[in-house]
UniProtKB/Swiss-Prot annotation:
Name under which the protein is recorded: Chaetoglobosin A biosynthesis cluster protein C
Organism: Chaetomium globosum (strain ATCC 6205 / CBS 148.51 / DSM 1962 / NBRC 6347 / NRRL 1970) (Soil fungus)
Function: Part of the gene cluster that mediates the biosynthesis of chaetoglobosin A which has a unique inhibitory activity against actin polymerization in mammalian cells. Chaetoglobosin A and its intermediates are involved in the morphological differentiation of C.globosum. The first step of the pathway is the synthesis of prochaetoglobosin I via condensation of one acetyl-CoA, 8 malonyl-CoA, and a L-tryptophan molecule by the PKS-NRPS hybrid synthetase cheA, followed by reduction of backbone double bond to install desired geometry by the enoyl reductase cheB.
Biased composition (Polar residues): 255-269
Keywords linked to the UniProt accession: DNA-binding, Nucleus
Region annotated Disordered, chain positions: 243-269, 320-350
């Protein structure tokens, strides 16, 4: 007979010592085949090591639950965070209480020990495809397929794969298997693939991928053969709808049971519960009142953690939108409404701007000079033209040379 696990034997030994006062710790350890020192530690109230938090743990249970809830909310909005984002959430909560940041592998280990979270590779999701993935529309399509098979007596063996190009005999995509073979050639330093090498690789990939099991799995996964629409409909996202407010639901309101509140309505109910308990408190144990206050504090702390994460998200969004706002506010000058653009049309706004700057410098007095001397007039170093810089003159000559060469051509 297989003996129970070590932890179960330890619990039985502690229970036996508690029930039988004459049973010594040494005898219980020998009877249940467990270490004597471990039983002594358990009798003094020490818990198992696996039940204790890690010594290097940075976040509390409430903070970790807040991060998990925030990740699930982001995933519900189709914006699941990366591991780097989860690490930033934890560091932001730690900065709120001046604690050191988490380690490099903290996010990976955090997701690993949370049963609600799992890492997946993201892929591009087309917006038009997402709009068509409506359970109602796809359910009607399955009904149409079933009606067509019943009307014309089509059996499962006569079902083929069609698309907008029809049935193309011999044209079957085997991308993953073919890609693996090409990778093997690349690792062998074969960078140029000829027709012969391609045909050999394609033949091997075709027979490796087009197996009976893969073909049947494709039709089974699509819910066609065997006919099972729920295999597809169950994977689609549930359409969002506005829930009914609790106050508008029929029936009598249930009395509030003390627990940790997570929204405004539950917070008000918990507060009313505490007020009622305090007003009816007369020479009774304050344990229930203290527990209710602790639950209210726990809920308020969780809300504060969520507010801190939201503030971090808003700050990052503002920082990302700041350059875009500057570009939108920038002044845009329309050079020409239509028609061909000539060199002179593009040069006239530049000349007017530079002449305006030169005239402004002439009218403004120089406060550093004696008697309010006028500022030095801006001239080009090449052609000595007033109000024109050397770079502008170079651009003018380049445009003229380009137009002349184009006309000669």
């Amino acid at each position: 007979m297989r003996s129970p696990p070590r932890e179960a034997r330890l619990r039985m030994a502690v229970e036996a010592i508690g029930k039988n006062k004459n049973l010594s710790i040494r005898a219980a350890a020998r009877q249940y085949n467990v270490p004597e020192a471990t039983i002594r530690h358990r009798c003094t109230g020490r818990s198992a090591r696996r039940d204790l938090p890690a010594n290097s743990r940075k976040l509390t249970d409430l903070e970790e639950r807040t991060i998990v809830q925030y990740i699930l909310e982001l995933d519900a909005r189709a914006f699941p965070p990366r591991l780097r984002g989860v690490e930033d959430m934890a560091n932001h909560l730690l900065r709120e209480r001046d604690a050191p940041p988490v380690g490099k592998l903290w996010a990976h280990n955090f997701v690993k020990r949370q049963p609600q979270l799992r890492t997946r590779r993201t892929r591009r999701y087309d917006y038009q495809r997402a709009k068509c993935e409506d359970p109602k529309v796809i359910g009607e399509w399955f009904t149409l397929v079933q009606d067509a098979k019943a009307k014309y007596g089509i059996v499962d063996d006569d079902v083929y794969n069609f698309d907008e190009t029809g049935l193309m005999m011999g044209i079957i995509f085997a991308g993953q298997a073919y890609g693996r073979l090409i990778d093997e050639l690349m690792r062998a330093h074969i960078n140029h693939i000829t027709k012969l090498e391609f045909l050999c690789a394609f033949r091997e990939a075709f027979f490796a991928s087009m197996t009976e099991k893969n073909i049947q799995g494709g039709f089974s996964g699509a819910g066609i053969v065997p006919f099972d629409p729920e295999r597809v409909l169950s994977k689609l996202d549930v359409k969002l709808h506005t829930p009914t407010h609790p106050d508008s639901r029929p029936g009598t309101a249930q009395p509030w049971a003390s627990k940790t509140p997570y929204n405004a309505q539950e917070t008000r109910s918990q507060s009313d519960f505490i007020k009622t308990r305090i007003s009816s408190y007369q020479n009774s144990s304050p344990a229930s009142v203290l527990v209710a206050v602790d639950q209210l504090t726990k809920g308020a702390t969780a809300v504060m953690h969520q507010v801190a994460l939201l503030q971090s998200e808003v700050s990052s969004l503002r920082k990302a939108n700041e350059p875009l706002s500057k570009r939108r506010k920038a002044k845009r000058t329309r050079i020409q409404l239509g028609g061909p653009l000539t060199v002179q049309d593009a040069q006239d706004p530049l000349d007017q701007r530079d002449v305006g700057k030169g005239a402004l410098q002439e009218t403004q007095p120089d406060s550093s000079g004696a008697g309010g001397a006028r500022a030095k007039v801006r001239r080009c170093n090449s052609c000595c033209k007033v109000g024109e810089s050397a770079s502008l003159a170079y651009m003018r000559r380049s445009l003229i040379i380009y137009v002349r060469s184009y006309n000669d051509f």
